[in-house]
Amino acid sequence: MAGLKSLAKDTAIYGMSSIIGRFLNYLLVPLYTAVLPAASGGYGVVSNVYAYTALILVFLTFGMETGFFRFANKAGDDPKKVYANVLMFVGGLSLAFVALCLTFLHPIASFLEYPDHADYVAMMILVVALDSFQCIPFAYLRYQKRPIKFAGIKLFNIVGNILLNLFFLLLCPWLYKVQPGLIDWFYDPDYLVGYIFVANLIMSAVQMLFFIPELRGFSYRIDRKLLKEMIAYSFPILIFGLVGILNQTVDKMIYPFLFEDRQEGLVQLGIYSATSKVALVMAMFTQAFRYAYE
């Protein structure tokens, strides 16, 4: 009975943090559509870049979250050794990804058709590498049955990101008009889209600090046999994950290519992405009502 109560409590914490997090993230949509000029295609750029990062995040985690739980709960395997090996694998893969992408940053930016904004691409490379690595400590918190810290970090990241967006997109433009001398040393009024990525990068870096306790006290030695087994187990999960995320994001990747004018494609993508977010929230409320009514 105690186990069922604990399960119900953990489910409530994970579920509420997920629902609240999604709703808070949705609040950024009206902010972006109000602040970013429609003709600039700014929100289209944001949607397009985040679509690529979602795909890369799945690749870099390599299905190792599920693999970690499988082997950490397997009789005969040391959970700490499993965790350390997963950390080293995902961390090494993320570092290699960052090094490779930053080396070929400008060709990648040109391929994605952001030749004048390689900085956007660079920031999101760092963000997706940090986020993929942090997926493993998050999994470790779940394994240790610590839902409060898990949910607290998630919500802190979301709230912090929202506050930074409000700072860069609302407060800074106002200060720039009334007292430009206060912020003109770091603020560029024409860099609004870039500040969205800056806010994300700041919060991803700050979030890393919360995981320092989950990174200490482990023996970081590669067990080749164990790692080989985990990779073999996780690889099919990676494939299914890539297929699943492509189903959710491929539209935002290819949308700009459907137009002869790239800029017009980004404008239309921004409209499309904003309306799809509205539909998503409506679906959440509809589902909640249906559950209550039935």
Give short role names for the model-derived ranges.
Residues M1-L7, Y176-Y195, M208-Q248:
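Interhelical loop/hinge segments that connect adjacent transmembrane helices in multipass membrane
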Residues A8-G21, K80-K81, V121-V127, L141-L169:
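Alpha-helical transmembrane segments of multi-pass membrane transporters/permeases
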Residues A96-Y114, C172-D184:
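Short membrane-interface helical motifs at transmembrane helix boundaries
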Residues A2-E65, S94-L102, V127, I162, ...:
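Signature of the first transmembrane helix
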Residues A34-G42, Q144-G152, I158-Q207:
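Membrane-interface helix-loop junctions in multi-pass transport and translocation proteins
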Residues L7, I19, F68, A139, ...:
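C-terminal transmembrane helix end/exit motif
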Residues L55, G91, L95-A99, T103, ...:
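Alpha-helical transmembrane segments of multi-pass membrane proteins
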Residues L60-G76, T275, A279-E294:
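Helix-loop junctions and terminal segments of transmembrane helices
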